[in-house]
Structures are given as structure tokens and as C-alpha cells.
Amino acid sequence: MWWRRLRGRWRATIIAAAAVVIIVAGLSVWILTAGRQSSEVTEAAALDQVEGDGLVESPAPGVPAPGVYSYAQAGWERVGAGPLGVRRELPGTARIAVGAVSPSSFEVTAFLSEEHIEGVRYGVAGGWIREEWRRTDVTLVGIGRDDRRDLRPPPRRVPVAPEVGQTWRDEYGAGSLPVEVSSRIARADELEVGGEAVPVVVIRVESTTGGAHPGTRSETVWWSPERAIPVRWRLEMDVEGVAELTTRTTLELDDLSPVQTEQ
């Protein structure tokens, strides 16, 4: 009957309105309680989350010194759903924690803020540093998802001995998500860190993710082959879906010597 159809429409309208109210309420709470500035992660907090035992004997070429590296950061991100969202400034200091797992593998956790953490486990084999596992943890008002996915087959991140002009392309699965990534070494350069000149190669990385969380990721990495760390890292990331994330940030290494855990 007509009143049943009308009642069904009312129910659908009420459910949709309730969903909008929940999203708006969450964004409003975040604005009132946390403002528009993300929180910086301290060295101590980053050290607490360094995976592995710290120092390992005879690390392979391509394995960086373990510890916490501090980076000056300038950036922002937007978190939201559809037209509703909040832009928040990222803190002026980011931390990257490196933990040695074995002589040929290590984990890197990039603390862009307390609310945005990126992690990768790397393995070194066949002249390449490869990504084996990736983590993305983004929260809003303490609510979010710590997404961890195995990468199969492990894509190539950077050659152990990179050369200008090298290019490579990989297709892999991040869990159930298909990913295509292409990289090239654009040029050699030199950056100064703490008064010391550091030779680097500039790597351009472009990736596209499909599936339930589609998005794009564009990176420019000023990579130190000798130290196996980024001296400068520029990230542009866009993730779509029910929840959306846009990140624009640049990190500059403050000190070549990491803060290490006590042995």
C-alpha cells in the first residue's frame, strides 16, 4: 500500500540522515578537542616502537643503522568522508624508527604524527631493497584503522647500488588490493645535513591502488645509498572510499646519527 512505501522511504531517509549526523558529530568533536594540529611523536615514544633487537652483526649492504631519525616536516592532510572533512596541519617534526630484524631485513615506521603512522618491512636480496609488508594507521578522534597487508610478490623499492637513469615497474597485491608502481632514478644530487654534504640520488615513485580503497601515491625521495635512508622525502597521497585521506608533506633529515636503544 502507499503508506507502506512512504514509511519505507522515511526509514531510508532517517538512516541516511543519521549517518550524516554521525560523521558531522565526529568531525565536530575532533575540531573541539584536538583543534587542527596533529600531535608530534616524541623520540622516546618512537624508540618504544622500534621493532627487532637493534644492532645486528654484519648487516647487509642496503640495511640502515637502527634507531630513530628526526626530520623537519612541513605538510598537512585532510581526513573525511565525501564533502565533509577536516584539514589538519602535520607537526613540525616527524620521526622515522628503524629496527633491524636480521642482517638482511629491517622495519621502518614513519611517525608523521600520532594520528598518522606508515610502516614497511624491507628485505634485501638480489641487489634490491624490497617491500614485504606495509602498514597504514590513520585515526580521527581516536577512531581509525591500523591497516596491515602483506605485499605479494614483494615489490622493488630501490637498488642497493642505484644508478641514474634506472627505471623499474612492479605489479603486486597488498592483501586483496591490486597495486601498480613505477619508479625511476632521475638524477644525482647532494644535500647538506648538519654541515655535512651527503650524496643522494633522486627517485620518483608513482603508484596506483585499486579495489575497495582506491588511490594514488606520488613520492620523490632523495636517497642516500651509503646510509640507506631518505635524506629528504616528499609525499603526495590520495585515498578514496568510505573514508578519504589526502596527505601532502615534505620531510628533511635533521641529523645523520639516529638515537638508538640502549643495549
Where do the protein language model's features map onto the residues?
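Secreted/surface-exposed cysteine- and glycine-rich disulfide frameworks
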Residues: 141-193
